């Protein structure tokens, strides 16, 4: 964009033109020369940058118009007043500002459109490095590893006496989020047969051995062969050394007021999620111990007694002892509830998968009916003749009922003797009665034997063979 300015070539021409118009002032001539010089100097730069050239052209034209207005106002000073000059100059200034704002917006838009971020080139995947606060940098190349191996950063220096929030957590088989160290000690205890050890969680190991194993656990190592009583003691010590015990969020009054199983369950729901998960893990651990009561001599009361002092912290020893008794009853109730739920789940699974399908009318096959009759008879016989693990929890109740029924049957069966050599075969689920009568039946006993067909109940039929 070029503008040609015409200047007078000789003084005569300028003098002749002064009659028709006013001669240009020296200031206008100097301004024109400066403008031409500016155009000549910036021509090379404008040729390289079109946006800058466009901006300078607009600025130049705005300045030219402004100078023309000033020159006209100076030549026509007698014709217009000062108010008109101010309005014209203000209008010219506004027009120049408006044009400059439009031009700047257009130039910024063009610059943004011209700026495009391209895809990276010559990319090479060297390594994938992740950071774990417990294991440090994982996947770091060898050349970037420090020469001196340092310990992996961790939120805590030890695994005993620290909060669960600063420990590495894992999920157990029941979905409880508990510290990993507890799961490691539990697996080690189970693999070495700790549940079958007599007095587990009641007998203590030597202090020197426990301290040595504790140091190895703090360094992150699990010894291969550890005494099961040492492991049990460390599990109790972990709960005992917590900064905030599992049941500290509950007041002693709340625990003491719980008298029924439903109240205990409602109280467990008041625990925070972390403490509730730890309590559920501990209850299931104690329930696993109680299931081997016939080997380890630890029933629900004994295991609850040894765990109760580790579940709470109190300053007064006398108050702590009294409170531990209430905590023991609380834990004992939860353990028995867990054992009962396990037994019910086993029974439900047994009913969910019958041995043989029934026919369309709903009647069972003969072998299935015989199996059910056998199971019913086995529940009413003495527990010494049956080796079924599913009926161990209810053996005492069944034996009490059988005692009353046996007394009634013995009074009705005094007129004949009892000959029995029957045995129960658990593998075939059938009752095999081997009746070997004596060489000669006693006189007067045949009438009693014929009365067996008229015995109404199943119990009387069973007791008649005795």
Curated annotation (Swiss-Prot):
Q: Where is the Rho-GAP domain?
A: 162-342
Protein name (Swiss-Prot/TrEMBL): Rho GTPase-activating protein 1
Q: Which GO terms describe its molecular function?
A: GTPase activator activity
Domain (CRIB) ranges: 117-130
Q: List the InterPro entries hit by this protein, alphabetically.
A: CRIB_dom, CRIB_dom_sf, Rho_GTPase_activation_prot, RhoGAP_dom, RopGAP1-5
Organism of origin is Arabidopsis thaliana (Mouse-ear cress)
Disordered: annotated span? 1-31, 65-84, 354-402
Provide one Gene Ontology biological process annotation.
Answer: signal transduction
Q: Where is the composition biased (Polar residues)?
A: 363-376, 383-397
Q: Which Gene3D superfamilies does the record cross-reference, listed alphabetically? A: CRIB domain, Rho GTPase activation protein
Q: Which UniProt keywords apply?
A: GTPase activation
Biased-composition ranges, Basic and acidic residues, are: 65-74
Which SUPFAM superfamilies does the protein's record reference? Answer: GTPase activation domain, GAP (SSF48350)
Q: Which positions does the site annotation Arginine finger cover? A: 202
